[in-house]
């Protein structure tokens, strides 16, 4: 594997709307981010990923972009963005942005021109098709529910959208459209952006025949991702994208890639891959329901553990993946992956350790470093997320009561990760002096940055130790390039693995069970690098782990 500048970096995702509001309008902004750069740097962060800050009607929280060259005024100005770039550079941090190029907003100039002239140049920037016998051109269900086809008033045509109807899909078959996108991407890279997180990118390749699929739900429709899984050729688009943009700037790119074919991993993240890396969603996909959140399966610990470790072994043949516990589209990891008895500061530290020391690029999501958790709301109107509202309806239609449907939303809603960051115990958790756009979590007086700054044993200060160990000069090589070797897999409650190079061996071992466990050490221990129980004595023959204990040991090689 060819060494790259980003291989040993740690990333932090900011969801700007919920990070910090500087002007009291209830919406986080660029000025708020600038004011917290020292806080982010102290966490050991090298790369900051900003969720969309482009001009947008915010139907889908900025993933519906109406102008790729403008900053949403809710977040600030281009001058403030340039200041953010400059201030991050002073601190030796890199900024990457979300790149949403499968679709745009229906308010984008291109789509407005297409609607005005359905036979004109801009109509070919999108997918317009005639209906079939008064019905949509095909039976695809969008990711947010309902048909992927929206009728164009006054015509017999429909336009295609895999997400909300306000997010028409862009026609990547059109070279003019592709060049427009490449020009925009290069404009941002010229400004000094270090790269992009690329949203929903595998969806850009369509089967232009748009064939019907066997219905998979009572609505008579089929999930649109079935087309994605059955069409070939996305790699040609991705190579063209890379060569015309990212490659010229040695940019760091991380793809959001679902529905990839099993044999394509090397094409996506190898030395000559389409992207620098892609997110590893293997653990998150385990809880995908057949019809929605309401029938999400229970995932037992061993399945979760073995899935992650199997993915590690598979990926290291090709390159590095990006590892996450949570992001803006997922519920909080502490609530999702830990049993109730482990949803404590000790358990939170354990979960963070086993994730951040995996092989790959760690991505920490805002609030994860203080152990923010899911929130319980008893009214669907408290939710803002378009996907949650759709999933609530699906659950009710499937026969769940209002209480049961809300319980499902409480577990899986994207708004769990979008509640404002809890900075202190003051009103609105110190996020805003106004009315927050989304309710602040009710536990903000117990879980907040200010309280944890003062507590040397807090989750926040533990995370700082964790990132420092990963980046320490004497361990950087093993944590960056060392192989992941699973250990103690016969245990019902232990997740353990070695990180190994030719000269070093590090053991990461965690007990997710309620009871203490003991196991025989396979190698002599040289040093305790980290413990969420503050242990410093090297174990000799036996490794004893209390409930929710994690320990990181340097072993003889």
Question: What residue spans do the PLM features occupy?
Answer:
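Hydrophobic residues within beta-strands of alpha/beta enzymes
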Residues: 48, 196-198
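Carbohydrate-interacting/catalytic domains
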Residues: 1-55, 82, 86-88, 361-364, ...
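Generic, well-ordered alpha-helical scaffold segments in large soluble proteins
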Residues: 36, 87, 184-187, 191, ...
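Conserved alpha/beta catalytic core and glycan-binding cleft of carbohydrate-active enzymes
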Residues: 106-139, 238, 242-420, 425
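Short acidic (Asp/Glu) and glycine-rich catalytic loops that position anionic groups and cofactors
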Residues: 217-220, 286-288, 329-334, 439-447
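Acidic/aromatic-lined carbohydrate-recognition and catalytic surfaces
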Residues: 2-186, 190, 203-263, 270, ...
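Active-site rim elements
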Residues: 168-178, 225-228, 333-346, 407-408, ...
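Hydrophobic "anchor" residues on beta-strands that sit immediately upstream
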Residues: 94, 98, 195, 252, ...
């Amino acid at each position: 594997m060819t060494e790259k500048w980003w291989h040993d970096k740690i990333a932090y995702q900011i969801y700007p709307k919920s990070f910090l509001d500087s002007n009291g309008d209830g919406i986080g902004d660029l000025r708020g981010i600038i004011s917290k750069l020292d806080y982010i740097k102290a966490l050991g962060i090298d790369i900051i990923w900003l969720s969309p800050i482009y001009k947008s009607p915010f139907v889908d929280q900025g993933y519906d972009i109406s102008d790729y060259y403008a900053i949403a005024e809710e977040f600030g100005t281009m001058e403030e963005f340039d200041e953010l770039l400059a201030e991050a550079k002073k601190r030796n941090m890199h900024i990457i942005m979300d790149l949403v190029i499968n679709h745009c907003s229906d308010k984008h100039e291109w789509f407005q021109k297409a609607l005005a002239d359905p036979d004109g140049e801009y109509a070919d920037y999108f997918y317009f098709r005639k209906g079939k016998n008064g019905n949509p051109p095909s039976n695809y269900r969008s990711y947010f529910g309902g048909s992927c086809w929206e009728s164009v008033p006054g015509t017999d045509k429909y336009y295609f959208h895999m997400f909300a109807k306000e997010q028409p899909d862009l026609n990547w078959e059109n070279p003019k459209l592709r060049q427009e996108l490449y020009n925009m991407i290069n404009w941002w890279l010229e400004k000094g952006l270090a790269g992009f997180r690329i949203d929903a990118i595998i969806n850009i390749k369509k089967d232009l025949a748009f064939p019907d699929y066997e219905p998979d739900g009572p609505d008579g429709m089929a999930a649109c991702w079935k087309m994605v899984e059955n069409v070939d050729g996305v790699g040609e688009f991705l190579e063209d994208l890379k060569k015309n943009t990212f490659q010229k700037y040695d940019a760091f790119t991380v793809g959001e890639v679902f529905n990839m074919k099993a044999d394509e991993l090397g094409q996506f993240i190898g030395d000559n891959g389409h992207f620098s890396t892609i997110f590893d969603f293997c653990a998150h996909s385990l809880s995908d329901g057949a019809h929605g959140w309401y029938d999400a399966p229970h995932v037992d610990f061993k399945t979760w553990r073995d899935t992650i470790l199997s993915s590690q072994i598979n990926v290291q043949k090709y390159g590095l993946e990006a590892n996450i516990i949570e992001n803006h589209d997922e519920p909080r990891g502490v609530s999702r992956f830990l049993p109730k008895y482990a949803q404590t500061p000790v358990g939170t530290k354990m979960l963070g350790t086993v994730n951040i020391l995996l092989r790959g690029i760690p991505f920490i999501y805002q609030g994860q470093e203080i152990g923010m958790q899911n929130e319980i709301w008893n009214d669907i109107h408290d939710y803002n997320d378009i996907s949650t509202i759709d999933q609530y309806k699906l659950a009710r239609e499937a026969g769940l009561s209002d209480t049961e449907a809300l319980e499902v939303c409480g577990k899986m809603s994207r708004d769990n990760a979008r509640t404002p960051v809890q900075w202190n115990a003051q009103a609105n958790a110190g996020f805003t002096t106004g009315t927050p756009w989304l309710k602040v979590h009710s536990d903000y007086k117990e879980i907040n940055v200010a309280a944890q700054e003062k507590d040397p044993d807090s989750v926040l200060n533990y995370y700082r130790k964790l990132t420092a160990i990963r980046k320490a000069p004497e361990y950087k090589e093993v944590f960056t390039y060392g192989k992941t070797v699973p250990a103690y897999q016969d245990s019902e409650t232990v997740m353990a693995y070695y990180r190994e190079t030719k000269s070093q061996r590090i053991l990461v071992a965690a007990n997710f069970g309620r009871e203490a466990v003991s196991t025989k050490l396979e190698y002599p221990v040289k040093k305790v690098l980290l413990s969420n129980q503050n242990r410093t004595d090297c174990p000799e023959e036996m490794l004893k782990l209390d409930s929710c204990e994690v320990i990181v040991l340097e072993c003889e090689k």
